[in-house]
Amino acid sequence: MKIVSCEHFFKLKYYKMKLSLRLLLLLPFIFVMVGCPNDDTTTTTEARPYLDVYNEDIAEIEDFMDTHFITVDGDYNVTFTEITGTTPGTPISDHPALNFKTISKGGVDHKLYYLKLNEGVGSNPTKLDSVFSSYKGYKTDLSVFDAASNPIWFQLEDVIDGWQEIFPEFKSGTSFTDSDTNVTTYSDFGAGVMFVPSG
């Protein structure tokens, strides 16, 4: 069995019981490849030390934040752009909305960076709440690896620890359903960006 881990970005739109919250986050994504040779013997690759993987991941996250900036539209959709000589911008690492939270996992303290672009006006979800969310996941090369353009329900206790820790930092918003079209619109929701190392 071979395990390859990489960090990714997730764009989230969070709606809790008709109230919404958007987040953009970096989510670990693990590819697991299992193969058996023709002689039916198996080989396994020993898992790497947790601290070594974390140190590599956090260095990659911090490098990304030092070399990219964000553009945010009126709906809190975020675009990441690499800083170059012809494309200047304020690095994410210098963004005034940048915060971090430290959690311990596997005996290693993990730094979870997040940008709080809008706090929201409603209630904060807890780690045990069910949330209604859409998202868009990016690899560190900015290619999209997963997306749910329409919101889906999931339990925060069933997702990665990073989501459980950062979702409660934001609040839900307000919603309005047009009785003629039955279309629900959301406003004043929490919105942000989250960066989560593997593990």
Q: Residue locations for each model-derived region?
A:
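Polybasic, lysine-rich low-complexity intrinsically disordered segments
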Residues: K2-I3, K13
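Bacterial N-terminal signal peptides that target proteins for export
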Residues: F10-L24
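Hydrophobic helical h-region of N-terminal Sec-dependent signal peptides
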Residues: L25-I30
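C-terminal motif of bacterial Sec signal peptides marking the signal peptidase cleavage site
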Residues: V32-G35
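Cross-family detector of peptidyl-prolyl cis-trans isomerase
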Residues: P37-G199
